[in-house]
């Protein structure tokens, strides 16, 4: 008798995706982040759902409702901090996942890669809107500054900003719609994740060597299910440690001050996971130029497959490209640091140098080094 997981209409889809899926035998821990992102998404949706039961999206009561959740709701403090720090974990896993894709050449699966970029934008939009909801000082001013960037779009900019605000400033209408979209977007992200997996399973997984692994495949279960569960335990332990010992480590103290349109905080900055893009935005003295650079800092991932000049897929056997890759990582850390600093000397010039280096490495140096490596290997 055939096993039910192979015949049942629903179970056979799950079976072909998570049980009998042929996977390369050489996958390292860098391949854990996809499943970790799935866990992060589940944690965020669950904690977010319970938070939404107690939250009110009104400018008069939003801040107090978050205080009420932390003080009066059973384990409300835990829900709130799991949700806030869960977002940080989400982005740590996201950036490592994208970095893995860049290092090992996973971007050659163009459909999977493009859906991934779309997912990155969707998660960033969700996180931005979520940061506005507690209605603290940084929530209000962050929303004002970032939405105002759209006014740099020629001709329609000002109308577009007022349309998003639902008035002439960030106010009640803005908060209400941000809450609606913040609730809706994670479910759109979940649907996109399914499409992402659908495209991935059309081609099968890449592996660290970048060499086709068709002759050497192993079943996903039990080998990689066990490996993924270990990853879950490590990540959830890290998240629990952060939440229970220093829940405000990654937050901004200004967000414990209720939003006040008449008082601007000394340094307006987004959460740490947007600081690299914020630094690129600030490094250009022109508003429209800054907005374009900001968008391109993420959108540049879409042209990475076109810029792939190497005859090899992965960087595993390309030491020169590896050096450039880690230089890029160092540049991103520098940008993240600069994004959190005030706009003054020497931070301005460091930010501008790092921004130029970021685009220079991806657009010119990596393709050039790939061609040099091809030449050295007589390919």
UniProtKB/Swiss-Prot annotation:
MF (Gene Ontology): metal ion binding; ubiquinol-cytochrome-c reductase activity
Q: How does it sit in the membrane?
A: Multi-pass membrane protein
Q: GO:BP terms for this protein?
A: mitochondrial electron transport, ubiquinol to cytochrome c
Q: Identify the gene encoding this protein.
A: MT-CYB
Q: Output the superkingdom of the source species.
A: Eukaryota
| Positions with a binding annotation for heme b b562 | 83, 182
What is the required cofactor set for this protein?
A: heme b
The keyword Disulfide bond appears for this protein: no
Q: What does this protein do?
A: Component of the ubiquinol-cytochrome c reductase complex (complex III or cytochrome b-c1 complex) that is part of the mitochondrial respiratory chain. The b-c1 complex mediates electron transfer from ubiquinol to cytochrome c. Contributes to the generation of a proton gradient across the mitochondrial membrane that is then used for ATP synthesis.
Provide the protein name: Cytochrome b
Q: Could you give the subunit structure recorded for this chain?
A: The cytochrome bc1 complex contains 11 subunits: 3 respiratory subunits (MT-CYB, CYC1 and UQCRFS1), 2 core proteins (UQCRC1 and UQCRC2) and 6 low-molecular weight proteins (UQCRH/QCR6, UQCRB/QCR7, UQCRQ/QCR8, UQCR10/QCR9, UQCR11/QCR10 and a cleavage product of UQCRFS1). This cytochrome bc1 complex then forms a dimer.
Q: What else is known?
A: Heme 1 (or BL or b562) is low-potential and absorbs at about 562 nm, and heme 2 (or BH or b566) is high-potential and absorbs at about 566 nm.
Q: Which GO terms describe its cellular component?
A: mitochondrial inner membrane; respiratory chain complex III
Give its localization: Mitochondrion inner membrane
**Residues that span the membrane, as ranges:** 33-53, 77-98, 113-133, 178-198, 226-246, 288-308, 320-340, 347-367
InterPro entries of this UniProt entry?
A: Cyt_b/b6_C (IPR005798), Cyt_b/b6_C_sf (IPR036150), Cyt_b/b6_N (IPR005797), Cytb/b6-like_sf (IPR027387), Cytochrome_b (IPR030689), Cytochrome_b_C_euk/bac (IPR048260), Cytochrome_b_N_euk/bac (IPR048259), Di-haem_cyt_TM (IPR016174)
Record-annotated residues binding heme b b566? 97, 196
- Indicate the segments annotated as coiled coil, or none if absent: none
Keywords on record:
Electron transport, Heme, Iron, Membrane, Metal-binding, Mitochondrion, Mitochondrion inner membrane, Respiratory chain, Transmembrane, Transmembrane helix, Transport, Ubiquinone
Give the binding site residues for a ubiquinone.
201
Q: How is the cofactor bound?
A: Binds 2 heme b groups non-covalently.
Q: What organism is the protein native to?
A: Artibeus amplus
* Keyword Flavoprotein among UniProt keywords: no
Record's family? Answer: Belongs to the cytochrome b family.
